[in-house]
Amino acid sequence: MARGREAVTLLLVGWGYAPGMQTLEALDAVRRADVVYVESYTMPGSSWLYKSVVEAAGEARVVEASRRDLEERSREIVSRALDAVVAVVTAGDPMVATTHSSLAAEALEAGVAVRYIPGVSGVQAARGATMLSFYRFGGTVTLPGPWRGVTPISVARRIYLNLCAGLHTTALLDVDERGVQLSPGQGVSLLLEADREYAREAGAPALLARLPSVLVEAGAGGGHRVLYWSSLERLSTADVEGGVYSIVIPARLSGVEEWLLAAASGQRRPLEYDRSVYETVEENCKKGVYMEPV
């Protein structure tokens, strides 16, 4: 099934974030590819992925790819795509993980045509589950695990900059080499530690601990559980059972958003949180406190 250089030879395929979420285009892609690489390390809780792809494509052409295969041995994948149709399949959407952007750039530089086949993104589904306005989400951040050896000061600053623009923040939780996701409590604890350090350097109070937060768990069947916390400080000490989570840190909520978020999280009464924290953040925004990196 070799193809000329003018044909699409590298397919970046999104498989959706749960079984049964595959598009017809994704199914067709793995069935016609000469070789199919399946990677699940960029999305925790996707152990189902390999079996699902094998059921669609047949086991003979499917290769389970490691982080090293895609990041350190990507040249081998690109070389193979010079004269064969190669599919790289990931849970969710392939362009959410920066690894796949790098792979696409390397392939294009080598003269390999690239085709992007979108999938249902777990990140976007988590945002949707909160029922907050799509247009009010700002830059996404990742809370790094302690194994990175970094203090996420830049993450704290990005959240403040989103708040200054009236935008909600989606915070992803880091994944280690074993595919285990950082726990929400530990991730938030490290963030609040970074916020205190950032506040000292910026000459402003640390405020993130007072912000409300939403924990969204992606269910294996595509459903979601939305858990509301009145403050990040409370979430940092919470004993949350194992699962695959994203965190949403809301900006100042509109009346409609507050009502919808309460409904999404099963709250039977108005949301409780420290509304005055937004006034303090907005005052600091006007003073330009968060504009200069530290």
From Swiss-Prot:
Keywords: Methyltransferase, S-adenosyl-L-methionine, Transferase. Disulfide bonds: none annotated. One of its GO terms (molecular function) is diphthine synthase activity. Pathway: Protein modification; peptidyl-diphthamide biosynthesis. GO terms for biological process: methylation; protein histidyl modification to diphthamide. S-adenosyl-L-methionine binds at residues 93, 96, 121-122, 173, 220. It comes from the Archaea. It catalyses: 2-[(3S)-amino-3-carboxypropyl]-L-histidyl-[translation elongation factor 2] + 3 S-adenosyl-L-methionine = diphthine-[translation elongation factor 2] + 3 S-adenosyl-L-homocysteine + 3 H(+). Belongs to the diphthine synthase family. S-adenosyl-L-methionine-dependent methyltransferase that catalyzes the trimethylation of the amino group of the modified target histidine residue in translation elongation factor 2 (EF-2), to form an intermediate called diphthine. The three successive methylation reactions represent the second step of diphthamide biosynthesis. This is Diphthine synthase. It comes from Aeropyrum pernix (strain ATCC 700893 / DSM 11879 / JCM 9820 / NBRC 100138 / K1). The gene is dphB.
